[in-house]
């Protein structure tokens, strides 16, 4: 009995999307006899790699991190923005036990509910729709005092665009009949991440003491005064919002504070100022004992406070499932995409699983990859072919970075050269897989090189696309392709080709049915 394994190989051609139109399309311009032949003669289909199908907002372009997480997880993995959008749409947000408990504690004690966050439609650190939903939640649970502390954007949105958002919040408060905007300040102060604690202190004092450099009777008036001082949204100085006869919105013991940013990096510092007992960033004039301080997502593992949406741990990703079944696997790529075939493909797990080997090929040391479009693909292919021939691995996951890394340069001829280099590599890998009696899937994590010019502006298109990506089967099994697939169907497809059971956590479906 032979102990030599017949591997199943997943080759991810990074940034290799599918586009019918040949205009400004480096993939169709390239001479690719091998990929052309495989596409014509082997079972194939197109799969989605962007938008809702990978857990991103509708029509948003895919990216390598999200792509590899979905590839390895075998299920759609919702990004925080989309996860919250879905929760609000399905109304489960309004029953979130952490958010409701915080509001209920404040209501029971007759205290205030404070909401703070980046008040914009930017969708990078937060979204105004989530804040509007939080106001609604607090009002529905009987909160009488609801105070919004609006951090203004101007980075992920145009520099002077906050007025529309502030008007939305004012309208929501009018609709629910309680609460108001209590302060405005630019994200430059409230969301610093470079230990410039003097900035954070200004935001902290504004919220805890209701003291700022300026005061205005309403938020729009405060914003317009800032513009008159030549402060764009990002740099608006601490402004207390308080109409005539309105009570102070200073934070008091027993109040609840909910931080509505979902991205961690710029939320950590001000959160630590509120919750750390041994805080040393600046001398706090007032330390508030909140009934609850809630962070919307986990900003850091060492921040000890309530979290409404803890990170979803991904159980039984492809890598973990292989290890549980005592299978061997190899992850191989160049420096540029090594983290993607390891950490991201494993669902955010840094350590290799038992039986998982890794090979890192150094990417070339050039200023930009248009100067060496083949990158280190020859060495990568040599090592990959060696691994296939070794008979050591049940599964091999490989990423060729060229289509993406050279596509990002915007240099068309270089992208064509990159694609042609890949075709030569695929020829060698295909021969090795067939000689070993193995099987291979060729796909991509997102598009890039198929769209090298922006038709709207005429400028080089250096970003990813939201186009589908190819999926090709190479092997000796008689298989039938299933259309309508997505990246999260790849792991179940690999397991099916290996004759393995698919874990229940994987909701993706096999895209090649063995006949």
Swiss-Prot record:
**What is an annotated GO biological process for this record, any one?**
glycolytic process
Q: Which cofactor does it need?
A: Mn(2+)
The source's superkingdom equals Bacteria
- Which keywords accompany this UniProt record? Glycolysis, Isomerase, Manganese, Metal-binding
Q: Which InterPro entries match?
A: Alkaline_phosphatase_core_sf, BPG-indep_PGM_N, Metalloenzyme, PGAM_B_sf, Pgm_bpd_ind
Q: What is its EC number?
A: 5.4.2.12
Q: Where does substrate bind?
A: 125, 155-156, 187, 193, 263-266, 337
* Catalytic residue list: 64
Q: Where are the transmembrane segments?
A: none
**Pfam families (UniProt xref):** iPGM_N (PF06415), Metalloenzyme (PF01676)
Kindly list the positions annotated as binding Mn(2+) 2. 14, 64, 445-446
- Could you tell me what the cofactor note in this record states? Binds 2 manganese ions per subunit.
One cellular-component annotation, GO:
cytosol
**Single GO MF descriptor:** phosphoglycerate mutase activity
The residues listed in the UniProt record as binding Mn(2+) 1, with positions renumbered to this chain, are: 404, 408, 464
Which pathway is it part of?
A: Carbohydrate degradation; glycolysis; pyruvate from D-glyceraldehyde 3-phosphate: step 3/5
Q: Which reaction does it catalyse?
A: (2R)-2-phosphoglycerate = (2R)-3-phosphoglycerate
Supply the HAMAP family for this chain: GpmI (MF_01038)
> Its family?
Belongs to the BPG-independent phosphoglycerate mutase family.
Q: How does it assemble?
A: Monomer.
Function, in words: Catalyzes the interconversion of 2-phosphoglycerate and 3-phosphoglycerate.
Q: What is this protein called?
A: 2,3-bisphosphoglycerate-independent phosphoglycerate mutase
Native organism: Cronobacter sakazakii (strain ATCC BAA-894) (Enterobacter sakazakii)
What would be the name of the gene that encodes this protein?
gpmI
